[in-house]
A protein has these predicted regions:
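Conserved subregion of the PPM/PP2C metallophosphatase catalytic domain
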Residues: 1-148
């Protein structure tokens, strides 16, 4: 953050969600720097990870970022995405929104690829190929104890 602030005459900023997984304790540590709340899927139920975002990177060089933790049991999935997903619009200028995002995660095949594909397919069906003006990025990670 300090480096970005010191070499940023244009005043640009970036959101970020940093995560460290601990496979020994079925949990993860994370910092949310102004990014969208991730969706977690546990036992077939999808919901937003309750986290208070800190300020975006590149805004204040003395910003403090709080490290939080969350449970991440065997079979759980976390889905990270850019705002181009929930802010995607259809031909009627309606947003895809958070409710559709959570529903897509919950109804998807419960693999990391399945969640990414499920969100993307729901998004494509909703927008009906209407032109989008922001990036659309979806990343999902599944805790699979049966794999190394």
């Amino acid at each position: 953050n300090r480096e970005l602030c010191s070499s940023n005459p244009e005043g640009m900023f970036v959101t970020a969600f940093a995560v460290i997984f601990d496979k020994n304790s079925d949990s993860f540590l994370y910092i949310n720097a102004g990014h969208n709340k991730p969706v977690t899927v546990s036992n077939g139920k999808a919901e937003f990870l309750e986290c208070k975002p800190c300020i975006m990177l590149g805004v204040f060089d003395d910003a403090r970022y709080v490290v939080n933790s969350a449970e991440f049991g065997n079979g759980d999935i976390i889905c990270l995405y850019t705002d181009g997903v929930n802010e995607a619009t259809n031909a009627d200028n309606e947003f895809f929104g958070n409710e559709r995002l959570v529903s897509a995660c919950q109804n998807a095949e419960q693999t990391a690829k399945g969640v990414c594909d499920g969100v993307y397919d729901a998004l494509t069906d909703f927008t009906e190929n209407a032109e989008q003006f922001d990036d659309i990025t979806i990343v999902a990670i599944k805790n699979s104890k049966n794999r190394d």
